[in-house]
Amino acid sequence: MAAVSLSVSTVKPLGDRVFVKVSASEEKTAGGLYLPDTAKEKPQVGEVVALGAGKRNDDGSRQELEVKVGDKVLYSKYAGTDVKLGTEEYVLLSEKDILAVVG
């Protein structure tokens, strides 16, 4: 079986799924102490980089997603599937797990 090379441009979410580039978590506290990886909170904010075609309705039509590529979003803490491409962190999640568009 041939190896598959993954990059952001080759990831196409299906249905109502959204591919989000995770914003970097805080490296140090307000007091200046550096946090080890085990003490960092899981990020909940990121930028939408790819969208699925939308959820299919009962009549066969597609329901357009509310978010767009480039939107900065806040999502549920433990939602989706974490994906690492190179050094970048991403999460693949359903649109229902997005809580808000921010900024």
UniProtKB/Swiss-Prot annotation:
Q: What is its main location?
A: cytoplasm
Where does this protein reside within or beyond the cell? Cytoplasm
Query: What keyword terms does UniProt attach to this protein?
Result: Chaperone, Cytoplasm
> Which Gene Ontology BP terms does the record give?
chaperone cofactor-dependent protein refolding
One GO location term (cellular component): cytoplasm
Among the Pfam families in the record, one is Cpn10
Top-level lineage group: Bacteria
State a single Gene Ontology molecular function.
Answer: protein folding chaperone
Q: Which family does it belong to?
A: Belongs to the GroES chaperonin family.
Free-text function comment from the UniProt entry = Together with the chaperonin GroEL, plays an essential role in assisting protein folding. The GroEL-GroES system forms a nano-cage that allows encapsulation of the non-native substrate proteins and provides a physical environment optimized to promote and accelerate protein folding. GroES binds to the apical surface of the GroEL ring, thereby capping the opening of the GroEL channel.
Q: Which NCBIfam families match?
A: PRK00364.1-6, PRK00364.2-2, PRK00364.2-4, PRK00364.2-5
Subunit organization: Heptamer of 7 subunits arranged in a ring. Interacts with the chaperonin GroEL.
According to UniProt, the name of this protein is Co-chaperonin GroES
Q: Upper taxonomic classification of the species? A: Bacteria, Bacillati, Cyanobacteriota, Cyanophyceae, Nostocales
The coding gene here is: groES
